[in-house]
């Protein structure tokens, strides 16, 4: 089973807090919000891989996070998928991003889809 985390929004309603930081990486109780999301799903043994789909603006932020994340709450590998959107005018939207991950990663398995900013 695969986990897909939707995190390609621009969080403009939270500016200036999210001007240079994606909302799922904002700290909540001392760790990024997305770490809480992953920890809440860590008990599902069937999940063997996770994908975070994001945009061009924040892809580097998520790559850096993925390289140093604490995997104690969620052991499977987490891969970052860049949808290459650069703003609200060319973003793919949730369904478009989901389709992108399914196709580009060759996923032919059950999936769980969650938002990266829901606790």
Where on the chain are the PLM-derived regions?
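A short, conserved beta-strand element in the Rossmann-like catalytic core
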Residues: 118-119
């Amino acid at each position: 089973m695969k986990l897909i985390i939707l995190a390609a929004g621009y969080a403009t309603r939270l500016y200036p807090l999210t001007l240079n930081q994606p909302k799922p990486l904002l700290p909540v109780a001392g760790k990024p919000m997305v770490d809480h999301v992953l920890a809440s799903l860590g008990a599902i043994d069937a999940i063997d891989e996770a994908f975070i789909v994001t945009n061009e603006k924040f892809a580097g932020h998520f790559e850096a996070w993925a390289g140093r994340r604490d995997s104690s709450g969620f052991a499977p590998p987490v891969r970052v998928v860049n949808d290459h959107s650069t703003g609200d005018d060319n973003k793919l939207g949730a369904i478009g991003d989901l389709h992108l991950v399914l196709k580009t990663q060759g996923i032919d398995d059950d999936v769980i889809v969650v938002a990266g900013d829901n606790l």
